[in-house]
Amino acid sequence: MIEFGDFYRLIAKGPLSPWLDTLPAQLSAWQRESLHGKFKTWFNAVEHLPQLTPTTLDLHSGVRAEMSPPISAGQREGMENMLRALMPWRKGPFSLYGLDIDTEWRSDWKWQRVLPHISPLAGRTILDVGCGSGYHLWRMIGEGAHLAVGIDPMQLFLCQFEAIRKLLGGDQRAHVLPLGIEQLPELAAFDTVFSMGVLYHRRSPLDHLYQLKNQLVTDGELVLETLVVEGDSQQVLVPGDRYAQMRNVYFIPSAPALKAWLEKCGFVDVRIADMAVTTTEEQRRTDWMTSESLAEFLDPHDHSKTVEGYPAPLRAVLIARKP
């Protein structure tokens, strides 16, 4: 079973220590009552991975680990088999001892769009909401973050993160917890909070923005990345049953509308830092994620539209400060 004791010890003497009033009981209840039916299979794959300590670790330009002398072909094959037991891999890519995990998303491209616009992460304590496999947590550590904490209720992603951590030498600077943002107390302890690819899945987007704000220290920075539509500050798309084949999409505002929402929630210095159309090069089917992807979600005759006839995915990055 995944143990969280190292994380508890890590936060016990710092600004996150009030979290210990609720977190251990939450995670104990999760382990007793909420495990996914496949969790034991996934965790078994993690347990059978070797504990490797790279001689070369690059978290600055990617997530890449090498060892000298290199691991054997047999070791690499065994490692690949265990990692494939954790498919589908959606967020990455990872390059581990000669094995490349080509994930559905080129999350490194998103990072390249975000990084130039945010405050330096060196020395910061960071929360990443909806962190997936934890790819961006490692990139945050690569930028010098003191501690990067990810939360995501999807248990496969937790196992993927623990697998990568094990192959990176058990690095304790990044941690993933199987929680949603609504399960966190108002910690007001993070220097930077990231919410990327989450807002459009929330039934109450303004509540989500308040939840993010409540995790930030005074003068802390929010990095918000989400789907948007073209339009003025009054423009919001409320899709019907599905958007790009996703059922749980509720509100897709324009970037100016999202800026207004952030200001309404009390954020200041709000700016639209980047906008980019999602391409089938950035999100696609791979050998590590073999089901349908963006190409199947777009109108085959007009890639400016989804199969439902809505505008194709356009993503914006907004930066804001908690006063």
Curated annotation (Swiss-Prot):
Q: What EC number(s) is this enzyme filed under?
A: 2.5.1.-
Please name the GO terms that the record assigns under molecular function. Answer: methyltransferase activity; transferase activity, transferring alkyl or aryl (other than methyl) groups
Does the keyword section mention Transferase? yes
Q: Which reaction does it catalyse?
A: carboxy-S-adenosyl-L-methionine + 5-hydroxyuridine(34) in tRNA = 5-carboxymethoxyuridine(34) in tRNA + S-adenosyl-L-homocysteine + H(+)
Tell me the GO BP annotations in alphabetical order.
tRNA wobble uridine modification
Give the residues the record marks as binding carboxy-S-adenosyl-L-methionine: K91, W105, K110, G130, I181, E182, M196, Y200, R315
The keyword Transferase appears for this protein:
yes
- The enzyme's first-digit EC class, named in words, is transferase
Top-level taxon? Bacteria
Q: Keywords on this record? A: Transferase, tRNA processing
Write out the function statement from the record. Catalyzes carboxymethyl transfer from carboxy-S-adenosyl-L-methionine (Cx-SAM) to 5-hydroxyuridine (ho5U) to form 5-carboxymethoxyuridine (cmo5U) at position 34 in tRNAs.
**Quaternary assembly:** Homotetramer.
HAMAP family on file: tRNA_carboxymethyltr_CmoB
Family annotation (PANTHER family): METHYLTRANSFERASE, TRNA U34 CARBOXYMETHYLTRANSFERASE
Query: What is the similarity comment for this entry?
Result: Belongs to the class I-like SAM-binding methyltransferase superfamily. CmoB family.
Q: What is this protein called?
A: tRNA U34 carboxymethyltransferase
Question: Which source organism?
Answer: Yersinia pestis
Q: Which gene encodes it?
A: cmoB
